């Protein structure tokens, strides 16, 4: 488990991370999302022990991270601007990382390189940006650490590659102790990968939620009722997060179980009723608006 408690980090007069508190459980894919400049990379670097918090503390499996070699054996960190030595091939990188991760899984590396259609003996300098990111994910998984920290690693990956990585992560989580932490400025890129998402804004954690729990407790229903009085009654009876109208069509986003919400709407004898799917972005819009923020100002 990763525990971030009241962590702050400033660069001159700019506070990149401000009293951030966050818990990341084992065997979940955790997404750390926020706009550019929200503090994601700084927080991830503090988790990786690259930077020391000015205030607060970070523990991985009960150990302080900064200047702790035992704690650092537990994770592999993929930077947003990872460096590859000149003329190195993918196979050369394996030799480099095996010095730090002796448990590196060579057989799995060969299998994944073939699965992702990457050439082991090809110079990395000839790889595209997406190919380099795929290579780093493969190396990170094969390093066989408990935690994998990814800073904007999924930025620009196409849907097919994201699905491949999602399947890879799911297989690793099923077979061993494995927890990926993914920082991204793009909610849509995290939607089909993460189990849990933390929203970072101005250096602080605005909210941290389990996605299935959020989807279970927030629903969007469109319906047509016989009159405005029924609409007003319904808005009082439900935990309404958002109401939209298009002519006679009423769209309600409300908190609660699907059955409880539908039961209250059905009691009004609607002329029409339909449950609509909610995207991760729509769920976050609802949550942040209730907290007094507009998501368009966060991203």
PLM-predicted stretches and their roles:
Residues 16, 194, 199-204, 274-278, ...:
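Amphipathic, soluble alpha/beta structural segments
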């Amino acid at each position: 488990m990763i525990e971030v408690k009241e962590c702050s980090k400033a660069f001159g007069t700019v506070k990149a991370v401000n009293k951030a508190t966050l818990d990341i459980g084992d065997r979940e894919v955790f997404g750390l999302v926020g706009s550019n400049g929200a503090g994601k990379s700084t927080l991830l670097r503090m988790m990786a022990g690259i930077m020391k918090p000015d205030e607060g503390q970070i523990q991985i499996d009960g150990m302080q991270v900064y200047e702790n070699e035992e704690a650092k054996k537990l994770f592999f960190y993929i930077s947003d601007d990872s460096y590859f030595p000149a003329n190195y091939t993918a196979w050369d990188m394996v030799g480099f990382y095996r010095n730090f991760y002796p448990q590196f899984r060579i057989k799995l590396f060969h299998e994944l390189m073939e699965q992702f259609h990457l050439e082991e003996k090809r110079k990395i300098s000839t790889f595209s940006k997406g190919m380099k990111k795929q290579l780093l994910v493969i190396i990170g998984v094969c390093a066989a650490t408990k935690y994998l920290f990814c800073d904007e690693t999924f930025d620009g990956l196409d849907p097919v590659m994201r699905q491949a990585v999602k399947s890879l992560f799911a297989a690793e989580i099923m077979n061993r102790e494995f927890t990926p932490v993914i920082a991204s400025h793009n909610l849509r890129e995290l939607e089909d990968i993460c189990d849990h998402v933390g929203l970072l804004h101005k250096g602080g954690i605005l909210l941290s939620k389990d996605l299935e729990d959020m989807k279970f407790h927030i629903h969007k229903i469109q319906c047509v009722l016989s009159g405005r009085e029924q609409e007003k009654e319904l808005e009082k009876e439900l935990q309404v997060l958002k109401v939209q109208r298009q002519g006679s069509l009423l769209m309600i986003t409300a908190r609660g179980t699907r059955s409880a919400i539908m039961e209250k709407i059905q009691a009004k004898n609607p002329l029409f009723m339909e449950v609509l799917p909610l995207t991760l972005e729509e769920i976050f819009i609802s949550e942040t608006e209730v907290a007094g923020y507009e998501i368009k100002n966060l991203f």
